[in-house]
């Protein structure tokens, strides 16, 4: 699918980043750092999340992807300052690392191929509704009920880690990136009159607003 068409279809149901002054300041500083180092991710976590991001939001002919847009820096900054309940989905990234290696029968991250990462994304993001319901139920029960002696199944942890990475990637790409706001979405820093009900195709050419 054409990226410009795909961006129109990204709904508000995706997880979004709650911006605070501290987070905005950290976003700005991490984007300008020439010798950037992660504040949240370990080296292995940084590598695996970066690879997933490149597949989820790849570069196209006319639009840069996750790597060029440095989305990993946004996500690392958000994870550093986010509330505890907002980062539950990536608290177990080491399990995601080990599970991805085991699934591909590889001994180290540098041996993983793009196909290995794609297979992992397909397994969890394209899983059937019944499987997703099982993972969600076990995950929710752990956090909502008495957790003594209970553990979340590994596959449920991996599913929520991958889902969180995807949701944060979309949020960083769509809402928190100046290039995308000005060149892909409809960006009007000084809005005109308010019209409560308009045809999106006529108003913006079908593009969503960069600022909501």
Language-model segments: residues:
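Structural motif
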Residues: 41-46, 62-66, 116, 156-160
């Amino acid at each position: 699918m054409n990226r410009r068409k795909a961006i129109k279809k990204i709904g508000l149901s995706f997880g979004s980043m709650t911006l605070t002054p501290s987070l905005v300041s950290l976003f700005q500083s991490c984007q300008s750092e020439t010798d950037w180092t992660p504040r949240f991710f370990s080296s292995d976590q940084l590598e695996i999340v970066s690879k997933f991001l490149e597949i989820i939001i790849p570069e196209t002919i006319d639009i840069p992807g996750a790597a060029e847009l440095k989305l990993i820096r946004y996500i690392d900054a958000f994870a550093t300052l986010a509330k505890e309940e907002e980062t539950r989905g990536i608290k177990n990234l080491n399990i995601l690392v080990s599970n991805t290696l085991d699934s591909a029968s590889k001994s180290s991250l540098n041996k993983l191929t793009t196909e290995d990462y794609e297979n992992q994304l397909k397994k969890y993001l394209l899983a059937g509704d019944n499987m997703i319901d099982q993972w969600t139920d076990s995950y929710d029960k752990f956090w909502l009920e008495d957790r003594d002696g209970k553990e979340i199944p590994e596959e449920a942890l991996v599913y929520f880690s991958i889902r969180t990475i995807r949701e944060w990637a979309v949020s960083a790409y769509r809402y928190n990136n100046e290039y995308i706001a000005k060149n892909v979405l409809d960006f009007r820093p000084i809005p005109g009159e308010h019209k409560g009900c308009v045809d999106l195709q006529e108003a913006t050419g079908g593009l969503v607003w960069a600022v909501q």
